[in-house]
């Protein structure tokens, strides 16, 4: 669960070893780096025996305490049903230490994975972790290729089914012409950094997904799910390990009927101004600008709805204190996205009212 930035002390320590890395000194670096991270209490063993980093807020970790690998398996690999796909193409956003990619390969050795990560330090760390799946060696080899090539040492990984892009995921998606069956969306929480939760970024993801493709995220944030609906996804949810709220599954043109999200969230996404998505039309705004822009648009939307007599407080929406004709829509045999759009159309006369 990428809730925050990695701990600054951890990043400083890792950078120190990145400077002396030459490919031949991995064993020596492993011993010293892991020891130093543990001594500084920034590398933490989780309940499944795998390791994660402390986050910027030292009370938090970058993965759930139940286990970094366990989280990758039960929040991403298994819900994606990757084992049922032949030669699936996977987009692994915010790859971090590689746990999600490792789990995906473990459950489908024929997966073609595009890993995207902006933080070199967390990628570098995976070279020195002991992750109990043999597929870790594949990911390590691709990371090794990146760091050796960067310092001018020629090295070619044997694994052509893994691609690694180090940089802003927004720039990557604009240039990509691939179509994906599975997208692991493991970004920091939208409250902290909404950069990869905007309607505009998610729309680009949608365009690059195959029919029946699924995007999976640990986040169940209302603006995120609202943006997914506006992009055309059919949203669903599944119970999550280590968290009270479920993970989000978003399908493109599924040939089956996904389970619905809870009815309270359906109503809030359909009718509350807090469902207003983040926007980043140029795919280049800073996180602070994205947050500021949404706050401004939210106030304008609220004023508009009050003026036309269509403003409902989130509290009354959650309690179901809304017009009966709108409430009845939730009894219809539709998926969550269809229900949300129908409620908006009936109440606001505009299913796309939140895309300002």
Swiss-Prot record:
It comes from the Archaea. The lineage of its organism: Archaea, Methanobacteriati, Methanobacteriota, Methanomada group, Methanococci. One of its GO terms (molecular function) is oxidoreductase activity, acting on the CH-NH group of donors. This is Uncharacterized protein MJ0670. CDD domains: AdoMet_MTases. InterPro entries: MnmC-like_methylTransf (IPR008471), SAM-dependent_MTases_sf (IPR029063).
